[in-house]
């Protein structure tokens, strides 16, 4: 054992082992902290650079000091580019669907007919796409959104102008009066106030037909009712007959003989209703009725024809093409606006119309609401 004053034996490598008050770094005395063994380093216990004292990386960085995946400026730019391309692609597809609406398949749920019925409303997508393009600050998306806008204006821009003009020598009105109408007398007064030469009424019951006959007798001394449809006229009627378009009578024809002009063949029609259900847009009976009506029109020899009624479909619906391809819409040629007629509380589609052949529409419009769920439609024509 060494005494306190003796030196330690040399180490095997020749380096003396410091002890007590020997040479070299002195041993800590009492509570004095040991000195760092590297000159200029951080104080003892300081965390490495990039690590917080608690051992957690600062917000927004990884332990290595970089941004988390997907939050870097490069990642955000990449996602924005993808969003812009998706938006531009959606706009182009939307424009193509609008432009090629007649080519959308009608198999299964009759998607094509439903799309064509609601076609005017497709323009509502354009402002939404423009807002998204502005949020993304994308010139590509903004330019792409112009495509559906141009297509919609091409299809319906003319309807936004007032094409009504003066002239005309025959005014006609058509109205689905609604079998459940609680005020047929009030409805008759609204119709009489329009001052038309000819009225065509659809969805008549035996009881309501009697009310209309009574209320309209003073202004319209000539009338005929067959099944659920009827024609009231200021001028004599001739050649009155039913038109068989369905198993039950929902169409008729009469010749209106006005003294100041040539006779006109007038049809009052009510095609079968359509249904939107889990089975899709069911239109079979209506389509059959349209084909039967088209056959009757093919055999019609009168040079001047007016078809008034509830077609339960829009003029552009391909299923009505057998009829509409032979006639012209007074609303499309001489109306103001889109002329929606149903439902009366918030008209969203035009399923009631005035179609003509051999006559010139001068003006077309809708009348004020009655007790029916349809709005009446009117047109002034030149023979």
Segments the model singles out, each with a brief description of its role:
Residues 42:
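Short Gly/Ser/Thr- and charged-rich N-terminal loops/segments
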Residues 172, 178-192, 203-383:
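Soluble catalytic domains of enzymes that build or remodel membrane lipids, polysaccharides, and related
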Residues 2-32, 39, 58, 63, ...:
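N-terminal, active-site-proximal structural segment of metallo-dependent hydrolase catalytic domains
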């Amino acid at each position: 054992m060494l005494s306190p004053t003796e030196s330690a034996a040399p180490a095997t490598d020749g380096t003396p082992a410091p002890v007590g008050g020997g040479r070299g770094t002195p041993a800590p005395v009492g509570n004095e902290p040991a000195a760092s063994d590297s000159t200029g380093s951080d104080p003892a216990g300081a965390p490495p650079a990039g690590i917080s004292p608690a051992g957690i990386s600062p917000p927004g960085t990884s332990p290595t000091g970089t941004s988390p995946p997907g939050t870097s400026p490069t990642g955000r730019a990449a996602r924005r580019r993808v969003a812009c391309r998706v938006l531009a692609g959606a706009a182009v597809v939307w424009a193509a669907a609008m432009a090629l609406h007649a080519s959308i398949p009608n198999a299964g749920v009759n998607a094509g007919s439903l799309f064509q019925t609601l076609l005017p409303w497709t323009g509502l997508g354009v402002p939404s796409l423009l807002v998204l393009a502005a949020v993304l600050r994308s010139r590509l998306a903004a330019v792409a959104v112009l495509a559906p806008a141009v297509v919609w204006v091409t299809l319906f821009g003319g309807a936004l102008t007032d094409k009504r003009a003066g002239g005309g020598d025959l005014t006609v009105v058509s109205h689905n009066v609604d079998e459940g109408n609680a005020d047929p007398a009030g409805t008759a007064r609204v119709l009489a106030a329009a001052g038309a030469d000819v009225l065509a009424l659809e969805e008549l019951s035996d009881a309501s037909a009697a009310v209309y006959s009574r209320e309209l007798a003073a202004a319209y001394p000539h009338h005929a009712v067959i099944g659920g449809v009827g024609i009231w006229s200021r001028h004599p009627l001739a050649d009155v007959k039913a038109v068989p378009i369905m198993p039950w009578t929902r169409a008729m024809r009469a010749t209106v003989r006005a003294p100041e002009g040539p006779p006109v063949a007038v049809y009052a029609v009510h095609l079968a209703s359509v249904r939107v259900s889990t089975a899709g847009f069911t239109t079979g009976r209506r389509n059959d009725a349209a084909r039967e009506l088209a056959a009757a029109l093919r055999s019609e020899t009168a040079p001047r024809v007016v078809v008034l009624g509830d077609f339960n479909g829009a003029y552009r619906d391909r299923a009505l093409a057998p009829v509409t391809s032979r006639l012209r819409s007074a609303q499309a040629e001489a109306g103001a606006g889109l002329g929606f007629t149903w439902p009366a509380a918030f008209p969203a589609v035009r399923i009631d119309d005035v179609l003509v052949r051999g006559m010139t529409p001068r003006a077309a419009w809708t009348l004020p609401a009655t007790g029916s769920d349809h709005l009446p439609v009117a047109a002034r024509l030149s023979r």
